[in-house]
């Protein structure tokens, strides 16, 4: 009798659980408590490390990575909160909004690193007319993506409140993520073009031939360094500077993992809010949480502040239409090094503000138009 009762209860448990979660914003899935608490701890540690690195290296653009850490912590707090109430809209929005936009800040920092690398290796390796153009173009693209996602989320929220279809809002939200993925795909092409130029093309130039052979690997970076920008040879050639030697590899790992994560998020929304991807947390764990963790840990170990000697070395981004190779060169490293920490920090701060000036003004104008649009529609209804 007891066995029969246990069997009956065992068969009913999945049905009871499904019924209890029928109002779940996660399509019936309950976020794993242990995993999400673990991620809060991990991101809390990474956030603390990046704050310390900012104070140690005074590399202004580290703030972008700190913003990512804060958003990831908040996002996983939202998922932990959702574990006890999967129908809580506040917890769900905290999770979705924070974890969705967090990679944008990491990519903003990465875009700026490519501009720095072009200054270190030479402008002739850049496909765009100015190193800062990479920051302008792709940060603007990310901001547009964020705005479109925000509009889509707003339309979904209004639809849920009014009890109408969320199809339009979903489509707008998907369009925002698609813009982000397309932007990253273009950046990846530019990034690999840059790597091809500094690792393959220079070796062809060095041997005055273009073989497609593994023999190119036998040519060391030291042998071809004369083909790079002379001014920063000390950054590239110092034997003990392993952080810089592997920095390009670290950047590649970070970009590819974040790109994988963004593709997953896009696929998740295309499948639907109650689709297979969003209702099976293992996909989120592997393709979102793990990818972002790998990217951030990589950028923590190979921090740009250490790679570029952020506390003592000035690498200003040259203005557009100015070729740094035509400027006076110096063999004296001391002319490049600046022992004034505050001065170097001010340089990084000015470059950060310059790179963000146009994107922020564009963002403000765009949001103003959106607000006016919703305001006019609200007045029309009244």
Curated annotation (Swiss-Prot):
Give the originating organism: Saccharomyces cerevisiae (strain YJM789)
Superkingdom of the source? Eukaryota
Outline the inducing conditions. In response to loss of mitochondrial DNA in a transcription factor PDR3-dependent manner. Induced in response to altered glycerophospholipid asymmetry of the plasma membrane in a transcription factor PDR1-dependent manner.
Where does it sit, as one GO cellular component term?
Answer: fungal-type vacuole
Question: Which keywords does this chain's UniProt record carry?
Answer: Cell membrane, Glycoprotein, Lipid transport, Membrane, Transmembrane, Transmembrane helix, Transport
> So which residues have sugars stuck on them?
3, 6
Cytoplasmic-side positions: 56-57, 112-135, 193-241, 303-382
Q: What does the entry give for GO biological process?
A: lipid transport
Give a short account of what the protein does. Answer: Catalyzes the ATP-dependent translocation of sphingoid long-chain bases (LCBs) from the cytoplasmic site toward the extracytoplasmic side of the membrane (flip-flop). Involved in the establishment of the functional lipid asymmetry of the plasma membrane. Regulates intracellular levels of LCBs, sphingolipid precursors that are growth inhibitory at increased levels.
Pfam families on file: RTA1
Name of the protein: Sphingoid long-chain base transporter RSB1
What's the protein's topology in the membrane? Answer: Multi-pass membrane protein
Transmembrane domains' residue ranges: 35-55, 58-78, 91-111, 136-156, 172-192, 242-262, 282-302
What PANTHER family does the database record attribute to this sequence? PROTEIN RTA1-RELATED, SPHINGOID LONG-CHAIN BASE TRANSPORTER RSB1
| Family statement drawn from the similarity comment of this UniProt entry | Belongs to the lipid-translocating exporter (LTE) (TC 9.A.26.1) family.
Chief subcellular location equals membrane
Intervals, Extracellular compartment = 1-34, 79-90, 157-171, 263-281
Q: Where in the cell is it found?
A: Cell membrane
């Amino acid at each position: 009798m007891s066995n029969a009762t246990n069997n009956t209860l065992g068969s009913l448990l999945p049905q009871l659980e499904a019924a209890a979660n029928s109002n779940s914003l996660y399509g019936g899935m309950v976020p794993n408590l242990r995993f999400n608490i673990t991620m809060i701890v991990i991101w809390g540690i990474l956030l603390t490390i990046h704050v310390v690195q900012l104070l140690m290296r005074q590399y202004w653009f580290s703030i972008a990575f700190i913003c990512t850490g804060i958003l990831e912590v908040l996002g996983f707090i939202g998922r932990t909160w959702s574990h006890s109430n999967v129908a809580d809209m506040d917890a769900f929005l905290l999770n979705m909004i924070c974890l969705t936009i967090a990679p944008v800040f990491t990519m903003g920092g990465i875009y700026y690193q490519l501009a720095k690398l072009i200054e270190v290796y030479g402008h002739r390796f850049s496909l765009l007319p100015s190193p800062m153009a990479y920051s302008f173009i792709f940060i603007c693209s990310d901001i547009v993506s964020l705005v479109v996602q925000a509009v889509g989320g707003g339309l979904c929220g209004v639809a849920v409140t009014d009890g109408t279809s969320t199809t339009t809002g979903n489509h707008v939200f998907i369009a925002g993520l698609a813009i982000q993925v397309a932007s990253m795909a273009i950046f990846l092409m530019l990034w690999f073009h840059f790597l091809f130029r500094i690792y393959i093309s220079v070796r062809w130039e060095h041997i005055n031939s273009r073989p497609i052979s593994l023999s190119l690997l036998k040519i060391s970076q030291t042998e071809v360094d004369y083909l790079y920008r002379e001014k920063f040879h000390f950054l590239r050639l110092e034997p003990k500077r392993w952080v810089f030697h592997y920095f390009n590899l670290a950047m590649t790992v970070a970009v590819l993992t974040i790109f994988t994560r963004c593709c997953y998020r896009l696929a998740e929304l295309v499948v639907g809010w109650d689709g297979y991807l969003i209702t099976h947390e293992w996909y989120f764990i592997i393709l979102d949480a793990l990818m972002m963790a790998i990217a951030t840990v990589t950028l923590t170990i190979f921090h740009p502040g250490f790679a570029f000697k952020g506390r003592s070395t000035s690498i200003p981004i040259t203005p557009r239409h100015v070729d740094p190779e035509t400027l006076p060169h110096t063999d004296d490293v001391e002319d490049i090094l600046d022992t004034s920490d505050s001065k170097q920090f001010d340089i990084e701060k000015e470059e950060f503000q310059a790179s963000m000036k146009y994107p922020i003004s564009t963002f403000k104008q765009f949001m103003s138009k959106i607000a006016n649009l919703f305001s006019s529609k609200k007045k029309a209804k009244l």
